[in-house]
């Protein structure tokens, strides 16, 4: 009897581990429904534009603000010396933050 229950219990545990979010499906995300209500009050009859506004409002609530990319100016490149210029030329200005100044 014990050997019959072992495979079924093991498979049940495996399914529970593969789908951990299914137990939390009962909870409703109220921030999305509140954002929808606010958009309907602000701009009625917008059509698909209203949907885009809702998507951006929900996205704004869920994601942290992004920092702007690091900009390397020519004057900074020249002031840091030849090794920095070689590094920037090799990696590109986007990744120049990790280049050594050589000082």
UniProtKB/Swiss-Prot annotation:
It holds the Pfam family Sperm_Ag_HE2. Residues 1-25 form the signal peptide. It is found in: Secreted. GO terms for cellular component: extracellular region. Keywords: Antibiotic, Antimicrobial, Defensin, Glycoprotein, Secreted, Signal. Specifically expressed in caput and proximal corpus of epididymis (at protein level). Present in the epididymal epithelium and on the sperm surface, with a subacrosomal equatorial distribution on the sperm head (at protein level). Its main location: secreted. InterPro entries: Sperm_Ag_11A_B. Glycans are attached at residue 29. One of its GO terms (biological process) is cytolysis by host of symbiont cells. Belongs to the SPAG11 family. Has antimicrobial activity against E.coli. Plays a role in the defense response in the male reproductive tract, contributing to sperm maturation, storage and protection. This is Sperm-associated antigen 11B. It comes from Homo sapiens. The gene is SPAG11B.
């Amino acid at each position: 009897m014990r050997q019959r229950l072992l495979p079924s219990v093991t498979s049940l545990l495996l399914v529970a581990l593969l789908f951990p979010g299914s137990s939390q499906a009962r909870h409703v995300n109220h921030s999305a429904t509140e954002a929808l209500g606010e958009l309907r009050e602000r701009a009625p009859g917008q059509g698909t534009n209203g949907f885009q506004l809702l998507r951006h409002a929900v996205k704004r609530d869920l994601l942290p603000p992004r920092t702007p990319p690091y900009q390397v100016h020519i004057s900074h490149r020249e002031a840091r010396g030849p090794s920095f210029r070689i590094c920037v030329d090799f990696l590109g200005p986007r990744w120049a933050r990790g280049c050594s100044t050589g000082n």
